[in-house]
């Protein structure tokens, strides 16, 4: 957004491998970390992961990695501290917690999850 105008800066691919026939099953949720340093995108279909990007000072993205999730990560939530990311996996019937490395943006499974039928959205109160 520059001078009250939305400006296209870059197109990125959120997953490296998308099997044939899955062209319409890409990212569901796209969110930025509270410190503005990383962008995350959930990839559905057979990829089932969270793509992680670093945001440069000029706003351009560079891919840092991907974190595997349960089936069909429909939504995710980054807590206010930026240290935790929760993923709602619709077809995995779960909400799973990941620890965020605030320097690299990479995620690590925190070993915490809850079973829920078909979760599709997460909100913080």
Positions of the model-derived regions?
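Short loop/turn segments immediately following beta-strands, especially the blade-tip
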Residues: 1-8, 52-60, 99-106
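A short beta-strand motif characteristic of beta-propeller blades
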Residues: 13-21, 62-67, 109-114
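Structural signature of WD-repeat beta-propeller blades
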Residues: 28-29, 74, 120
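Short coil/turn segments that connect the beta-strands within blades of beta-propeller domains
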Residues: 35-37, 81-83
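Short loop/turn segments immediately following the C-termini of beta-strands
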Residues: 44-45, 90-91, 100
